[in-house]
Amino acid sequence: ESLYAGRSMDGSQFARESLGLRFEKKNITDVIKKIEGQVNYSYNDHIMDNFSLRTPPLVEMNHGGMTMLMPNAMAMQVTRRTLNSRLAMTSEWNKWSLITGVDSQFNKHGGSMSSPTMPSMNVPYRQDMRFQSYGAFGELGYQWNDQNKLVTGARLDRVTVEDERADSQAKGFNTKLEKTLPSAFVRWENQHPEHDLKSYIGLGYVERMPDYWELFSPKHGNAGSTNTFNGVNPEKTLQLDLGFQQQHGALNTWASAYAGLVDDYILMSYHHHPSMGMDGHDMSHDITAGAKNVDATIAGAEAGIGYQFTDRIQADLSAMYAWGKNTTDDKPLPQISPLEGRLNIRYVADKYNLGLLWRAVAEQNRVSLHQGNIVGYDLKPSKGFSTLSLNGSYNLRKDIDVSVGIDNVLDKTYTEHLNKAGSAGFGFASEEQFNNIGRNYWVRMSMKF
C-alpha cells in the first residue's frame, strides 16, 4: 500500500513480476573482444482507489427530483507488460574501438475503472496502448594519443505506438503513430597526467518519443489537433556538455556543465477542462493537463571539492544549478530545480562507517504557474530550506550489512520545489503543495547471496 499525498487516489494493491536472462562471451578473436546479450521481461499491476486508505469525496446525485450527497468511491487498475532485448558486439584493433548492436522494446498498457456508488462509470479492463521500438546503434572510439581520445556514436530507432482506446476508434481518429528517431554524439576526452586532470567536451543530438502518459493522459494536444495522441510531436534536443575531474593527493575537484536547445519540448498546462456527464452537466471538479510543444533553452552546472583529512575522515562540498526558458512564450521553463548545495562528511572504518549530510536549497522564483510536465507543475515560487541527516552502517559478516539513519534531524517543515502534487498520469491534479516528511528514523539490512 502507498498513500499519495498529492493525488486523488492511493495505491492500494501492487503486483510485480520480472525475469531476466543475460549472456556474455569474451576474447572471441583478436579483434572481437566481447559479444553480449540480454532479455528482460516485467509485468506491473497497480490498483488505485480513493476509499481503502482515505474517505472518498462526496458528490451530488439527482434521484427522483431529490439531490443527495453520495460518496464518490472510485478504483482504477493500471497494468504494463514490457519485453526488452539487447545484443551488442565490442571490437578493438590498433587505436580503434567499436561497439555495435541492436535492441528492441515492446510494451502493452491497459486498465479499468470501477465505482461502487456509480456503476454507470464502470469501464471493464481493456488494453489501450501497444508500443514497439527497434533500434540499431554504434559507438566508435579512436585513441588519438596517450592523452587524447575521440568518441562518436549514433543510433536509429523505429517506433510504433498504437492507440487501442475504443473512444479513439469510434471517433475515427488516427490510431497509429510511426516515427523514425535519429540520435548522435561526438565527444573529445583529454587526460593531463602531470596535473592529475581528466576533461571532456561533447555535443549530442537526440529525438525522444512522447511516453504513454504524455500521449494518453492530457485532455488535448497542440492547437488544431484532433486529440493528444495525434497532437504532440517528439522532442528534439541539441546539447553541449563539458567537464573535468582532478585528483591530486588528498584533494579532489570536479565540475560539469551543459547547455542545450530543445525543439518541441513537451509542456503541460494544468487548468480546468469541462467533462460532461450524461445529463449534460459539467462533471469535472479537478484541474487536468493539456499538452503542447514549445521551443526551449536549457543550461546547468555542477561543481564540487573533496578532501581526505585522514585515512578515515573525508568530506566533500558540492553545488548544482539548473536553468531553463520557454523561448516560444518567453517564460521560465517550469519544474526546474533551484540552486542546491551539499556538505557530506564521512568516517570510514574497517567494519563500520558514519556519515553526516547537510543540504541547503535556495528559493526558486523562476516559475510558470500551472505549467510543468507529466509529473507535476509549478504552483507558486518556493522558499529555501536546509536539512541535516545522519547515517551509519555496520558490516555484521561478509555478506550482511545493517544501515541506520535519521533524516531531517532538526525536524524542519519544508517543501520541495519539484513537488509531485500533480497527477496528470491518472487524470487529476492537486492545487496543494505538501510538506516533506519530518524527522524520520530508518533501518535497512542488505544481504548478498
Show the residue positions of the predicted features.
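Conserved C-terminal beta-signal and adjacent last beta-strands/turns
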Residues: S12, K26, L140, I201, ...
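Outer membrane beta-barrel strand-and-loop segments of large Gram-negative receptors
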Residues: M68-M89, M129-F137, N227-N233, Q239, ...
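Gram-negative outer-membrane beta-barrel transporters
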Residues: Y142-L150, R158-V159, Y258-V262, H271, ...
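Small/polar-residue-rich segments within soluble enzyme cores
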Residues: G243
